[in-house]
Amino acid sequence: MASLRKTHPILKIVNDALIDLPAPSNISFWWNYGSLLFLCLIIQIATGLFLAMHYTSDITTAFSSVAHICRDVNYGWLIRNMHANGASFFFICLYLHIGRGLYYGSYLNKETWNVGVILFLLVMMTAFVGYVLPWGQMSFWGATVITNLLSAVPYVGNALVQWIWGGFSVDNATLTRFFAFHFLFPFVIAAAAVIHLLFLHETGSNNPAGVNSNADKISFHPYFSYKDLLGFALMLLALTSLALFTPNLLGDPDNFIPANPLVTPPHIKPEWYFLFAYAILRSIPNKLGGVLALLFSILVLMVVPILHTSVQRGLTFRPLSQMLFWTLVADVLILTWIGGMPVEHPFIIIGQVASVLYFMLFLVLMPLVSWLENKALRKPIELA
């Protein structure tokens, strides 16, 4: 008689996705980040739910309700620190996951990749509206500056901004709707993640060699389930260490000051994980151009599969393309640094050069170098 997990309508789905799933035998720890992102999402939803029980989305009490959570609620300080730093870990795993996809050519699973880019945008939107909720100085001014960018949309820009604000400035209506969005989006992300997984299991995982692995598959459980558990343990260790020892390391000190519409902070900047995109936005003097560059800095990922010119899938055996990949990594780090710097010389020109290089790498240099590598691989013509 067949096992219940193989016959039960619901357990059968779980079995095919997490137990009897055939997986390539040679996938490295770079394939752990998908499950780590799932863990991050679970942590964020769980801690967020407990925070929502005590938080009030009203401009008169929002800031003090966060202080109340940290001071008066049992382990409220821990829940808040885990949630705030959990967001940072979410983005660390996300960037490493995307980097893995770019390095090993996982983007050639087009449906999986495109759903992944949509997931990335959803996570960014969720993090942005979440950052507004404590109603500190950086929350208020960050919301004002970023939502104001929509006024660059031709014809309907101003109406669009006022529609999102729910008035003529960032006010109580804005905070209330941002809280509603922040509560809703994680569940949308969870649903999109299931679709992401569904598309992945249509084709199966890629592997470091970038070749077809059908001849050498092993079951997901116990091999990769235990491997994932090790990843969980290491990430939870890192997250709890950060939340317990230096919880405010990645935050902005300005957000400990209650929001004041009459006083502008000296440097308005988003959380560290948005700085690379913020630097690209600031590097273009034109408002609409900056908004388009900001949007395209993420959407350029959707173009990557179309511009894949190599005969090989990954970068494992392509040293020139590897060099460009690590140039891209360095470029994103430079943009992250520039995004946190004031708008003055020499940071302006560094940001502009780094922004141009960012798009050049994706749209011109990588496809061109891949094409040249193809030429180098061709068998030389034998002279008679």
UniProtKB/Swiss-Prot annotation:
Transmembrane helix in keyword set: yes
A single BP term in Gene Ontology: mitochondrial electron transport, ubiquinol to cytochrome c
Transmembrane stretches, start-end: 33-53, 77-98, 113-133, 178-198, 226-246, 288-308, 320-340, 347-367
Membrane topology value: Multi-pass membrane protein
Cofactor requirement: heme b
One Pfam family, short name: Cytochrome_B
GO MF entries: metal ion binding; ubiquinol-cytochrome-c reductase activity
Residues that coordinate or bind a ubiquinone: 201
Binding site for heme b b562: 83, 182
Key words of the record: Electron transport, Heme, Iron, Membrane, Metal-binding, Mitochondrion, Mitochondrion inner membrane, Respiratory chain, Transmembrane, Transmembrane helix, Transport, Ubiquinone
Subunit record text: The cytochrome bc1 complex contains 3 respiratory subunits (MT-CYB, CYC1 and UQCRFS1), 2 core proteins (UQCRC1 and UQCRC2) and probably 6 low-molecular weight proteins.
Family per record: Belongs to the cytochrome b family.
Protein name: Cytochrome b
